[in-house]
Amino acid sequence: MNIYVWLFAIIALSFSALVGLRLSFKKGTANVLVGESIITVVAGTLIVVISQKYNLAFADTIALAIFICGVVGAFAFCKVIGGDNEKAKQPN
């Protein structure tokens, strides 16, 4: 992997992580879930990029586990915090 491509990927992932953190600390459940999803994707992608640089064989499995746990955690959070759906307006 070219050093400039690697540095660009690291810098882009760093900015994405900062955006995800900023979004996570805003009010509202939706903002927190989107921010958490961004951080999960950034962490998994960062692990894959670093594994390409340093030739780590097990990093792809760890990144896949992070992606899956992030999605499952977001759905579990929605289910627990979601509340009662009977009070929601139903479309006609």
UniProtKB/Swiss-Prot annotation:
Q: Where in the cell is it found?
A: Cell membrane
- Superkingdom assignment: Archaea
Q: Which residues cross the membrane?
A: 1-21, 30-50, 62-82
Q: How does it sit in the membrane?
A: Multi-pass membrane protein
Annotated Gene Ontology cellular components are: plasma membrane
What is the species listed in this Swiss-Prot or TrEMBL entry?
Answer: Methanocaldococcus jannaschii (strain ATCC 43067 / DSM 2661 / JAL-1 / JCM 10045 / NBRC 100440)
Belongs to which family?
Answer: To M.thermoautotrophicum MTH1250.
Indicate where this protein is primarily found: membrane
What is this protein's record name?
Uncharacterized protein MJ1223
UniProt entry keywords in alphabetical sequence: Cell membrane, Membrane, Transmembrane, Transmembrane helix
Q: Which residues form the signal peptide?
A: none
